[in-house]
Amino acid sequence: MKPLHYTASALALGLALMGNAQAVTTIPFWHSMEGELGKEVDSLAQRFNAENPDYKIVPTYKGNYEQNLSAGIAAFRTGNAPAILQVYEVGTATMMASKAIKPVYDVFKEAGIQFDESQFVPTVSGYYSDSKTGHLLSQPFNSSTPVLYYNKDAFKKAGLDPEQPPKTWQDLADYAAKLKASGMKCGYASGWQGWIQLENFSAWNGLPFASKNNGFDGTDAVLEFNKPEQVKHIAMLEEMNKKGDFSYVGRKDESTEKFYNGDCAMTTASSGSLANIREYAKFNYGVGMMPYDADAKDAPQNAIIGGASLWVMQGKDKETYTGVAKFLDFLAKPENAAEWHQKTGYLPITKAAYDLTREQGFYEKNPGADTATRQMLNKPPLPFTKGLRLGNMPQIRVIVDEELESVWTGKKTPQQALDTAVERGNQLLRRFEKSTKS
């Protein structure tokens, strides 16, 4: 029989170990990263957890951006929100008005962790900052710009220079016709049509998408994307669609799969699609800048970001917020932010991550990997090309999708579709404006 004092000591040790295990603070993190991107999110969380045994980040895929935002807000209303919610860029105004969030600069301040907001690339951080205080409301994470992916092997077969992607939309239309004639099922397809064909088309060509500097200067903004330049662009795509040179394959990122499986020779898609293209494409491909309108004065201007940021939700305890601050600080460290950028194709969110990536020779070894960054920094942004801050923007994107689909199916002219999209979208803007003043 073991001595009593030994048994008591063992019991005390066991209880202490149990207490330590129970002291681990679990931090739910809801996101929209799937495929290779989801694997990278899991990898970052696992590494943080290993380095910080008192905390456990639990990443959970909750569907696409719209589904995740809806799930997060619904969970907040029932008191079951995650600690961290990934929300796409057009959900920024909605999150600001939701009263469901705790600004990240407050989270860091209360946790006693130094937070250098100036470390983030200004054109990215400006999108997620409080326009009154200049402080970050959410932390940039997977920021992107649209880029052009093209099949170099298909270019060769069609008699096109594989090192020269089309620079203008007029060039792209010509290339798509030649690629289709050479035997490709699809010359060109586009992902995220509202973000690329209207929001970024407008910024890249120096045009406003909405008044009040795209909503940054007030909730009384009105949509302005039904002007002659945008109508002409959609009309060009309509003509390509009729000829079979442009294929509409879906509202989200469906065109990326059509590209990497070899169906479509070119696609405009998020720079964040690069991870899946690297993984699945079985041909030589290139990454080019977004085309611009050859008739646009002073184009190209600058791209506006897409992707998402990380919002901290209200209603958590102090220890949870301390863990959240530590995790966000971990993500922003140069080596981690650089790794995320290099593995996914998303933008380097900090200056240090960009510098480190360049010093490591990544851009020299991977031509085109800096395309998204060069587009974002192509020219200093104009007041109306730094992004969008429009209420109910996720719903407005759905309206834009519906109206553009009416063009691709021949039910409306480009002018009719964009006029209707502006009219319907403005109704949502007025509803949002009213809600912020009530």
From Swiss-Prot:
Principal cellular location given in the protein's record: periplasm
One Pfam family linked to the record: SBP_bac_8
Residues binding sn-glycerol 3-phosphate: Y65, E89, S144, S270, G307, Y346, R397
Intracellular or extracellular location(s): Periplasm
Record text on activity regulation: The chaperone activity is activated by the transition from pH 2 to 7 and inhibited by the addition of G3P.
Recorded consequence of changing W192H: Cannot bind G3P. Fails to stimulate ATPase activity of the complex
One BP annotation, GO: glycerophosphodiester transmembrane transport
Keywords: Chaperone, Periplasm, Signal, Transport
A GO term from the CC aspect: glycerol-3-phosphate-transporting ATPase complex
Subunit text: The complex is composed of two ATP-binding proteins (UgpC), two transmembrane proteins (UgpA and UgpE) and a solute-binding protein (UgpB).
Similarity annotation: Belongs to the bacterial solute-binding protein 1 family.
Descriptive protein name: sn-glycerol-3-phosphate-binding periplasmic protein UgpB
Species this protein is from: Escherichia coli (strain K12)
Gene this chain is encoded by: ugpB
